[in-house]
Amino acid sequence: VLLLDASVWIAAKDRQDRYFDPARTLAVDPALPVAALDLTLYEVANGLGARRGRHDEAIDLCRLVAGRCGEGLLAVDAKLIESALELAAEHGLTAYDAAYVAAARRHGWTLVSTDIADLVSKDLAVTPDAADYP
């Protein structure tokens, strides 16, 4: 299972993003098992809707995330937050980024992100074009 962070979902809607094509494939191909955190919905709404003013697209994308992930849309719990805080301190991450890392590790999933500086460069995630499709 590929755990897609918000950056991947947003890249799948942005034709100008360098990861548009592989992100789009991950976001829409029903043959590829994907998951997301409930946090992802807020990050998508913030990144696409609040920051870029693309409210309708943000709502549509949140619906896609929820529909595409189904039961793979994970709720953040206290244990995940505890793990996330440990990872945040260890790797100099935000609690948000660390939550994705913690969830991927808990479930044995691959974290996919376009966040080169904070996640990919630290070998905590792979880019959409490097994700191993099952």
Give the ranges of each region predicted by the language model.
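Short, conserved active-site loops that position catalytic residues or coordinate cofactors/metal ions
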Residues: D38-N46
